[in-house]
């Protein structure tokens, strides 16, 4: 007999995941899978940097267990330098503020384990990435309390009233809010005023503020205005007395650097020693020594300038422009993206569940796979996340297949 924790996972969560993500191949067509938010536009350059780092720095000591509380010191120093250079913290980040984890999901799970007792809640605005359900609920047994915010208010000061309402009406105790900035799947950033308002909400209600900033450097120029919209890290705002012990940032190399398989995430918290030490304890030796060897080279300022400033932003902007024109030419509603690897768009006309199921079936026949907004806990039908962080020729093929699916759906309705 399995434990009660495991029984819930096998009876509820695993069947749901199989229903949502299983999609067989359509005939002889290789399906273009745009359901995973992976960054492929830097793959070649990142691979070159990793090969170079291993060739220069790998030695026999790296085959031993990792050393250091919270991860290898050299890697944590590089992360601290990167955050100080790129995230504009109000207080300088030191290696002692960082715990390394095998990915951002593990970082979130670790934070929730220390913040929430089983059955306690975390406020998250919908739509949100469904992987958070796994990170927060499967092991820590916390509960997500969904905050439904209209899209036109999602990044506005008026959004705070929805958090207040969710807190007031929650049937379970709330211990934290979790923000994704830049946002997945909406592809926008929160401005400084909204961040300050949300911090004030947390301070008034004694809630932890967790900021998932894994897309922090995947900010690209606005196609219409030719400017780079600002990403504001929560590290630049947690300045009120006593607030730093309640504010925690999560980062990972996976999205910005296009290396999800390396499994390197980080918890950054600057005023909560107990949480840091507890996190270091349960993540001890979980990050590979090989990954730790790579990090200092990958985060070296010369490398980040080339990868992020010169290559990533221009390539994401180019591909976003392709998707934007495709949607505009078809008269489809979408959330204009400024950051991230995707666009959130409504591909339906009638916006019914029947049409959404038909769209999914037609896309399968056309050889393309998207994730529906309902999988992100969005209440409206026919919204999909279109991932565009692929080689530009593949983006062209994907858009052609999506267009074919839309045409077929319209004929069948």
UniProtKB/Swiss-Prot annotation:
Q: What class of enzyme is it?
A: transferase
Q: Does the keyword Disulfide bond apply?
A: no
* One GO term of the biological process aspect: amino acid metabolic process
Induction text: Expression is co-regulated with the other genes from the sirodesmin cluster and corresponds with sirodesmin production.
**Which top-level group of life is the source organism from?**
Eukaryota
GO molecular function terms noted in the UniProt entry = pyridoxal phosphate binding; transaminase activity
UniProt-listed Gene3D superfamilies = Aspartate Aminotransferase, domain 1 (3.90.1150.10), Type I PLP-dependent aspartate aminotransferase-like (Major domain) (3.40.640.10)
Provide the positions where the record notes the PTM N6-(pyridoxal phosphate)lysine. 255
Role, per record: Probable aminotransferase; part of the gene cluster that mediates the biosynthesis of sirodesmin PL, an epipolythiodioxopiperazine (ETP) characterized by a disulfide bridged cyclic dipeptide and that acts as a phytotoxin which is involved in the blackleg didease of canola. SirD catalyzes the O-prenylation of L-tyrosine (L-Tyr) in the presence of dimethylallyl diphosphate (DMAPP) to yield 4-O-dimethylallyl-L-Tyr, and therefore represents probably the first pathway-specific enzyme in the biosynthesis of sirodesmin PL.
Q: What is this protein called?
A: Probable aminotransferase sirI
User: Whose protein is this, by species?
Assistant: Leptosphaeria maculans
């Amino acid at each position: 007999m399995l434990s009660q924790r495991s029984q819930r996972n096998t009876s509820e969560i695993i069947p749901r995941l199989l229903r949502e993500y299983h999609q067989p191949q359509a005939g002889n067509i290789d399906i273009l899978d745009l359901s995973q938010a992976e960054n492929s536009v830097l793959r070649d350059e990142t691979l070159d940097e990793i090969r170079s780092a291993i060739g220069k720095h790998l030695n026999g000591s790296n085959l031993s267990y990792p050393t250091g509380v919270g991860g290898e010191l050299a890697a944590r120093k590089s992360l601290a330098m990167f955050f100080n250079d790129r995230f504009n913290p109000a207080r300088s980040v030191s290696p002692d503020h960082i715990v390394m984890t095998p990915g951002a999901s593990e970082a979130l799970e670790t934070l929730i384990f220390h913040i929430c007792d089983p059955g306690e809640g975390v406020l998250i605005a919908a739509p949100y990435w469904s992987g958070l359900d796994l990170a927060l609920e499967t092991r820590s047994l916390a509960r997500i309390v969904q905050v439904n915010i209209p899209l036109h208010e999602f990044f506005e000061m008026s959004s705070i009233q929805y958090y207040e309402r969710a807190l007031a009406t929650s049937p379970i105790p709330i211990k934290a809010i979790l923000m994704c900035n830049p946002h997945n799947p909406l592809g926008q950033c929160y401005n400084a005023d909204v961040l300050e308002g949300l911090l004030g909400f947390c301070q008034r209600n004694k809630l932890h503020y967790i900021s998932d900033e894994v897309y922090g450097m995947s900010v690209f120029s606005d196609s219409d205005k030719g400017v780079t919209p600002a990403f504001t890290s929560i590290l630049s705002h947690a300045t009120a007395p006593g607030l730093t012990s309640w504010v925690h940032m999560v980062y990972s190399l996976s999205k910005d650097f296009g290396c999800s398989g390396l499994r390197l995430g980080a918890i950054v918290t600057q005023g909560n020693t107990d949480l840091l030490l507890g996190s270091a304890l349960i993540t001890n030796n979980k990050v590979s020594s090989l990954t730790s060897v790579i990090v200092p080279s990958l985060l070296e300022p010369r490398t980040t300038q080339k990868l992020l400033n010169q290559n990533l932003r221009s390539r994401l902007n180019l591909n976003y422009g392709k998707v934007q024109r495709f949607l505009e030419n078809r008269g489809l509603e979408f959330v204009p993206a400024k950051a991230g690897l995707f666009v959130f768009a409504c591909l339906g006309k009638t916006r019914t569940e029947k049409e959404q199921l038909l769209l999914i079936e037609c896309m399968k026949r056309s050889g393309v796979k998207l994730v529906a907004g309902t999988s992100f806990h969005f209440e409206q039908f026919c919204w999909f996340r279109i991932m565009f962080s692929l080689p530009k020729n593949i983006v062209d093929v994907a858009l052609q297949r999506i267009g074919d699916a839309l045409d077929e759906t319209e004929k069948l309705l």
